[in-house]
Amino acid sequence: MRKEKKIEFLKILNQYQIIKKEKIEKKPSFLSIETARYHLNGNITLIREKIKKNHKDGSAIIVIPVTKEQEIITVIEPRVCIKNGVGVGFPAGYIEENETPEEAAIRELQEEIGYQPEQLIPLISFYQDEGISSAYNHAFLARNCQKVSEQQLDPDEYIQYMKFKTEEIEELIQMGYINGSNSLLAFQYAKEKMRRMRK
């Protein structure tokens, strides 16, 4: 990775570093837990808890956006639950009610980075954490993305984005900056898909 690009990347990371944490007493408004008893064949009964997000299962999409210049767009945002407090990954978000995964992918691209793809290719669908959630995620490769608007972020959403070559993404993974399972899985499938398409 070029020195100037690395400096720009680290500058963005530094902007989102946690400098102080204050615990507050507040009833959760987004997360809830549903407890149920399950009766299985073989005379087995289980009691399990399931996490719900905004009263839904929390199914989401993740998109690997690639420009016409073959650069991959990453997003950098505060992720206060992880060790260093800053997440580096790819555009992602929840699937809204009455929305298909494809529609959610296109919406999230426009909201988070202001880009629109010429082609959206499904890569893989997977359960995020089947032990406590029914969230079923969908990964996409977005080809020939073009800038069409400014970001359309929520008031409490802070996202910056940067473009990288495939080798630079691999470097960020090796350095531990991209470490979310959704991002890692989607990138591996996207990389393989792009390799096969070049043949």
What is the predicted function of each stretch?
Residues 23, 49-50, 77, 127:
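Short clusters of small/polar residues that mark proteolytic maturation junctions
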Residues 59-62, 67, 93-181:
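Unchanged
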Residues 1-20, 85-86, 97, 155-199:
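Nudix hydrolase/Nudix homology domain
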Residues 18, 23-24, 122, 147:
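Residue-level detector of beta-propeller blades
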Residues 27-28, 82, 130-132:
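Short glycine/serine/proline-enriched coil/turn segments at secondary-structure junctions
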Residues 2, 50-52, 61-107:
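Conserved Nudix-box catalytic region and its N-terminal flanking loop in Nudix hydrolases
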Residues 24-64, 68:
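Acidic, metal-coordinating catalytic segment for phosphate/diphosphate chemistry
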